[in-house]
Amino acid sequence: MGFHIYEIKARQIIDSRGNPTVEADVILEDGTLGRAAVPSGASTGTNEAVELRDGDKSVYMGKGVLKAVENIINIISPELEGMSALNQVEIDRKMLELDGTPNKSKLGTNAILAVSMATARAAAEHLGLKVYQYLGTYKANILPTPMCNIINGGAHSDNSVDFQEFMIMPIGAKTFSDAIRMSAEVFHTLKSILSKKGYATSVGDEGGFAPNLKSNEEACEVIMEAIKSAGYTPGTDIAIALDPATSELYDPKTKKYVFKWSTKEELTSQEMVEYWAKWVEKYPIISIEDGMAEEDWDGWKKLTDKIGNKIQLVGDDLFVTNTSFLKKGIEMKVANAILIKVNQIGTLTETFEAVEMAKKAGYTAIVSHRSGETEDTTIADLVVALGTGQIKTGSLSRTDRIAKYNQLLRIEEELGSIAEYHGKDVFYSINK
């Protein structure tokens, strides 16, 4: 026995941007400890679950999380003590019941998620299993094709690039470790190219470079140059993935997309769709996330109709890992993929439900980090457990990003000959 929850502890720690975040310890009767820390985002969807912040401007500029910590200690812990850590669904449902709001604004998604993940870690430890084995089925053996962020723009940097993330995907790699090697080689090659062009090679929140490029196109051009210079073929060995985060560019009053960091150009929804269609013809782009704004459902529909059969179109701000929004998207035939961010929804149970719904509808799913991360590696285990085949967890720099890749390398080693890496085949929503 000994698998019942004895006590839950919580504390305020610091994330990769120097902001406070929540860490929880779930301690079982036999002394087993499960620990988890939650991330936070810079560009957030308006429908995301609420991250509870203290709001006291004199402490951490109002970003303290002591209220969330107190909620774990004073409200969640007494209610969960004595419950079986092996029943993740029951634990998560109990916390949702305790919160009682549609967006987790009472207890805070940062409090609920920390306990949800720590419970899974404690249960896995108690059973002598790895987290991916515990959360996954008997066939949790697919290593993800990574989306590696190598150039940052928009809200993630201070340059003249409108789009938030330019990423590479090693779709031609044979194994996950090969994929990481290829990505690292392109990352280092890009650094040399930027340096020779006189650009800064400091990195942004997610470890990608944030050079003051002259245009959005130049970002794609230097990435293409880096892929070729590293000895790879763009589109065959390594493809480009984008997260323009266009909700940040959209003006709901004029219903136009404003390229506020570069040309100040304003585009209608239809013009934005045509813009992406041209880019997909010009560059080896395999995936675009948030290509249209979260409130521009008509624009999303037009984009999906235009290029949804050619590339992966990922809803992040659009779906916020929430089954009700995903259901709407599926019914409207909008997008063909969902980004999975555990802290957008707040529990592991709801995360699994969202992935299940996506898979049933033929939508792909990508497990993702946030721009404010910690050393916690739960999402690395989660992506293998869920078998989504894709992960987005930053660049090949910064320990908060590398921690996830290193955990996946360990998992690949543990799986040995049964480890699978699907490369381009993960795009089942377009490989029909």
Curated annotation (Swiss-Prot):
<dbReference type="InterPro" id="IPR020809">
    <property type="entry name" value="Enolase_CS"/>
</dbReference>
<dbReference type="GO" id="GO:0000015">
    <property type="term" value="C:phosphopyruvate hydratase complex"/>
</dbReference>
<keyword id="KW-0964">Secreted</keyword>
<feature type="binding site">
    <location>
        <position position="370"/>
    </location>
    <ligand>
        <name>(2R)-2-phosphoglycerate</name>
    </ligand>
</feature>
<dbReference type="Pfam" id="PF00113">
    <property type="entry name" value="Enolase_C"/>
</dbReference>
<dbReference type="InterPro" id="IPR000941">
    <property type="entry name" value="Enolase"/>
</dbReference>
<feature type="binding site">
    <location>
        <position position="371"/>
    </location>
    <ligand>
        <name>(2R)-2-phosphoglycerate</name>
    </ligand>
</feature>
<keyword id="KW-0456">Lyase</keyword>
<dbReference type="InterPro" id="IPR020811">
    <property type="entry name" value="Enolase_N"/>
</dbReference>
<comment type="function">
    <text>Catalyzes the reversible conversion of 2-phosphoglycerate (2-PG) into phosphoenolpyruvate (PEP). It is essential for the degradation of carbohydrates via glycolysis.</text>
</comment>
<dbReference type="GO" id="GO:0006096">
    <property type="term" value="P:glycolytic process"/>
</dbReference>
<protein>
    <recommendedName>
        <fullName>Enolase</fullName>
        <ecNumber>4.2.1.11</ecNumber>
    </recommendedName>
</protein>
<dbReference type="Pfam" id="PF03952">
    <property type="entry name" value="Enolase_N"/>
</dbReference>
<comment type="similarity">
    <text>Belongs to the enolase family.</text>
</comment>
<feature type="binding site">
    <location>
        <position position="243"/>
    </location>
    <ligand>
        <name>Mg(2+)</name>
    </ligand>
</feature>
<keyword id="KW-0963">Cytoplasm</keyword>
<feature type="binding site">
    <location>
        <position position="392"/>
    </location>
    <ligand>
        <name>(2R)-2-phosphoglycerate</name>
    </ligand>
</feature>
<dbReference type="InterPro" id="IPR036849">
    <property type="entry name" value="Enolase-like_C_sf"/>
</dbReference>
<feature type="active site" description="Proton donor">
    <location>
        <position position="206"/>
    </location>
</feature>
<feature type="binding site">
    <location>
        <position position="164"/>
    </location>
    <ligand>
        <name>(2R)-2-phosphoglycerate</name>
    </ligand>
</feature>
<comment type="pathway">
    <text>Carbohydrate degradation; glycolysis; pyruvate from D-glyceraldehyde 3-phosphate: step 4/5.</text>
</comment>
<dbReference type="InterPro" id="IPR020810">
    <property type="entry name" value="Enolase_C"/>
</dbReference>
<dbReference type="GO" id="GO:0009986">
    <property type="term" value="C:cell surface"/>
</dbReference>
<dbReference type="GO" id="GO:0000287">
    <property type="term" value="F:magnesium ion binding"/>
</dbReference>
<dbReference type="GO" id="GO:0005576">
    <property type="term" value="C:extracellular region"/>
</dbReference>
<keyword id="KW-0324">Glycolysis</keyword>
<keyword id="KW-0460">Magnesium</keyword>
<feature type="binding site">
    <location>
        <position position="289"/>
    </location>
    <ligand>
        <name>Mg(2+)</name>
    </ligand>
</feature>
<dbReference type="GO" id="GO:0004634">
    <property type="term" value="F:phosphopyruvate hydratase activity"/>
</dbReference>
<feature type="binding site">
    <location>
        <position position="341"/>
    </location>
    <ligand>
        <name>(2R)-2-phosphoglycerate</name>
    </ligand>
</feature>
<keyword id="KW-0479">Metal-binding</keyword>
<dbReference type="InterPro" id="IPR029017">
    <property type="entry name" value="Enolase-like_N"/>
</dbReference>
<feature type="binding site">
    <location>
        <position position="316"/>
    </location>
    <ligand>
        <name>Mg(2+)</name>
    </ligand>
</feature>
<feature type="active site" description="Proton acceptor">
    <location>
        <position position="341"/>
    </location>
</feature>
